[in-house]
Amino acid sequence: MTAEFAYLNLTELRPEGWLLDQLRAQADGITGRLEELWPDVGPSSGWLGGPGECWERGPYYVAGLLPLAELLDDDALRAKTAPWIEWTLASQRDDGFFGPAHNRDWWPRMV
């Protein structure tokens, strides 16, 4: 049986035209500036090691920001994702658990 669809890496696709315009507007708008506008995804986020919100807001923010950065090949947006990813990877403990220590729920880690 042949596959109906082929798997592609995100970077194998490049937006053009209307879609590129929409993604650029997103990057230049709220998504690209959300940490300036919403404290829950700012420097005090629990997902950056701070005392703030540690549920799903940070992970969802990064889950949208990283693909946007890759689709636009935008180093400034990539730089915004780096602290989130680096902190999350560095937060892994001896038992394998990762993320904010004061929230042991798995849900925000599955984003």
State each model region's role.
Residues 1-57, 79-99:
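Low-complexity, Ser/Thr/Pro/Gly-enriched N-terminal "stalk/linker" regions
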Residues 52-70, 108-111:
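Well-ordered alpha-helical segments within folded domains of soluble proteins
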Residues 65, 90-98, 105-111:
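Aromatic-lined, polymer-binding surfaces characteristic
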